[in-house]
């Protein structure tokens, strides 16, 4: 299992403040809302590529971490949940990539703590070739209703523990964020083994 002392140490170590790593681009208001809360565009970490929106109304979802059919939800019908807030990570190698979403209360949802008191859930934890199941390489965190107001932070980590060496090499990832029935953003980043980075921060 990857639930090792090394993992605990990683979670406890100092990480540069997320907002300090974000691009300096202005954060602009969108027309959408999540519940009664105004949604603003996420701030994106340096080196993260913003994916230009590309979807087709009525298209089949491809289970790729994107909204393929323009309905504001990510990968519905792919075996994991949507909600008033959804963060979905996808990749296409045998790597074991982990998604971390920290809510405004400071609780982090990830494989070692898959629910939060604010109502967040990790309902799909993929281990790539480390899991041996052949399951889809997707991780998904969602709030079905009433996500708390405040700033959310999203990080990803390429697990490279001694219990599983996949030799998957650098792995491109896609991450999308949906709130209140609209896509806030979609992002690409290529991780290397044992790398953990902040991807985005966004307020609701």
Report each predicted region and the residues it spans.
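N-terminal compositionally biased, intrinsically disordered segments and leader/signal-like regions
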Residues: 8, 31-34, 50, 138, ...
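C-terminal motif of bacterial Sec signal peptides marking the signal peptidase cleavage site
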Residues: 22-25
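Extracellular calcium-associated, cysteine-rich motifs in secreted modular proteins
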Residues: 47-82
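Intrinsic-disorder/low-complexity signal
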Residues: 76-204
């Amino acid at each position: 299992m990857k639930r090792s002392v090394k993992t605990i140490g990683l979670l406890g170590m100092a990480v540069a403040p997320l907002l300090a790593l974000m691009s300096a681009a202005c954060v602009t208001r969108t027309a959408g809302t999540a519940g009664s809360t105004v949604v603003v565009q996420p701030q994106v970490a340096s080196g993260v590529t913003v994916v230009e929106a590309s979807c087709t109304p009525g298209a089949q979802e491809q289970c790729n971490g994107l909204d393929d059919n323009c309905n504001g939800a990510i990968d519905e019908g792919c075996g994991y949940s949507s909600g008033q807030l959804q963060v979905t990570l996808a990749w296409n190698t045998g790597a074991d990539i982990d998604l971390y979403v920290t809510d405004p209360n400071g609780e982090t949802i990830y494989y070692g703590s898959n629910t939060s008191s604010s109502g967040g859930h990790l309902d799909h934890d993929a281990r790539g070739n480390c899991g041996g199941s052949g399951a889809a390489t997707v991780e998904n965190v969602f709030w079905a209703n009433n996500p708390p107001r405040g700033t959310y932070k999203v990080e990803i980590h390429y697990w490279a523990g001694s219990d599983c060496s996949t030799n998957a090499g650098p792995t491109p990832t896609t991450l999308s964020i949906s709130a209140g029935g609209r896509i806030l953003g979609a992002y690409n980043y290529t991780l290397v083994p044992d790398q953990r980075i902040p991807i985005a921060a966004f307020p609701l």
